[in-house]
């Protein structure tokens, strides 16, 4: 018979043990067991452990059941009384099995919440484990030690504390290294190695895999912490740098303010001293005046006749009075002079400029500089004023700075400034920087707030004082005087010379040339050859400029005339080509009977001159022989008959003998090419051209179109 031992385990309650026999009864000690192999299965939470064995010793089974029940009761009572802290397994370890002997005890099952199936191959091992559990149940210390022992994959509190302290110490050090308590082979100390050796191969691989995953997670966290620490360190360094820079700026501003305050204090102390002296002198004068008033009042009150000594004092008294009056005059003069000096040294508006509007009062625009650049007062008026100068571009935007004019210089380049030309430049100062700029780079716009603050910072950093309101008022007055300046003849001559010096060409070449010729003649008369040579060079230069301007002026005109002449020649050539082509077409054209031709009648009698006709007849007779053309003498006779001056007898003879007229020999074999005869026939039939241009005859269709019939 085979017997089975089932051990059930609940999640929250105490462990309960049931041993079903082969016949289905629980707890009967008489069950027998047969078989040579045993199998143990452990399920999660509501699992059961089933042990099949074929040992013949039934008494050992009963003892084992009793020992297991007693052990479970003891563990429950001990846990209720003592309630010792149980170390929880690590979250990252997924191993739920172990090779320890506590798996066969109920105490260890009470502490654990999960388990895995396990097989026992030998019967002797089961007996040894049962004996061990029995011995452990008998001793409370052993059971408590076993219950408090950490499971596989768990980390004890001491280990966690040590690891946390080590991590803190490592984090405090700069060269931190990752360490999770295991070596490179994922094994710990000797106890850990022994415990892993006791596991099966599958459990060992699972445990190592869990450790690898845990190591990766911890390593990732370690790297993230390290990066965060480095970032925090960088932020701290940057903050420290910023704080140091701010402190330096504050120190500079404090130093500058202290300098300004010390200077103001010195000025105030001097002013107070002068005020004290002045107040003392005034008090003395007041006291003397009061004394005099008191004396006169006493004398009037007494109304007694005045003595000569009282009215006319002695010389000594007069001298004393004179001395006192001189002293009072001196004190008043000194006080007035002190006041004047104080006004000069410490004007009422001695405060430095604080707004861009105040500085804009002495700003010069490019338009003003263009008007004044040739004036005699230019250098004097401009020095001390301010301009808005362009220094270049930044991100495709122009950049301007506030600069003070310290002087006027002449540059090597002559440039165009509006409607005039000049070579003058402004020497500008911005803080410690000084540079020469041309007038064309000055802006017409006013100073902005940002530009004003930039200039103010540059002045403070250079340790220079800002201009006061009194200086600005004085400069503004000088600008107004320049606007209302009255010119004299000498100023006008200087302005004209200055403008002519930079002018490319004179406004009137003829006038300039005549003036130079006069000067040359005067120099030659006086015998000054050097001056005459200089004037001749000027004349040559003037002629060259005039020729260059003439070439430039007539350049376009000559080009246009050349184009017109070329077009005319081309039109003539094209018209000749068209005439030749039309004549060829006329020759090759066949006769059209429907074409209307010009048929202007001609009077035969008046058609030709008789002398010309006789010459033609003589040529024809010489070529073809006499009597070839009978029509010619006939026409001749007709013409002579009509004419009154001709002989009537010859005409009557020709008209009477008609047979003789037709009695002549005709040569048929003529040595004339056919092409020539054809050409003669065509030319004779063609209408005469008018004005040398061919004229095409109208056909019926063109005629109807012109008349509006079609």
From Swiss-Prot:
GO terms for molecular function: RNA binding; single-stranded DNA binding. Residues 20-214, 228-357, 627-650, 674-710 are annotated as: Disordered. Residues 110-130, 228-240 have a biased composition (Basic residues). InterPro entries: Plus-3_dom, Plus3-like_sf. Changing residue 401 to E: Loss of binding to single-stranded DNA. Disulfide bonds: none annotated. It is found in: Nucleus, Nucleoplasm. PROSITE patterns: PLUS3. Keywords: Activator, Coiled coil, DNA-binding, Nucleus, Phosphoprotein, Transcription, Transcription regulation, Wnt signaling pathway. Changing residue 410 to K: Reduced binding to single-stranded DNA. GO terms for cellular component: Cdc73/Paf1 complex; nucleolus; nucleoplasm. Residues 158-170 have a biased composition (Low complexity). The keyword Membrane does not apply. Residues 192-214, 241-251, 269-291, 632-647, 692-704 have a biased composition (Basic and acidic residues). Residues 24-33 have a biased composition (Gly residues). The modification Phosphothreonine is found at residue 55. Residues 53-65, 312-323 have a biased composition (Acidic residues). Component of the PAF1 complex, which consists of CDC73, PAF1, LEO1, CTR9, RTF1 and SKIC8; the association of RTF1 appears to be less stable than that of other subunits. At least in HeLa cells a N-terminal shorter form of RTF1 is also found in the complex. The PAF1 complex interacts with PHF5A. PANTHER family: RNA POLYMERASE-ASSOCIATED PROTEIN RTF1 HOMOLOG. The Plus3 domain mediates single-stranded DNA-binding. This is RNA polymerase-associated protein RTF1 homolog. It comes from Homo sapiens.
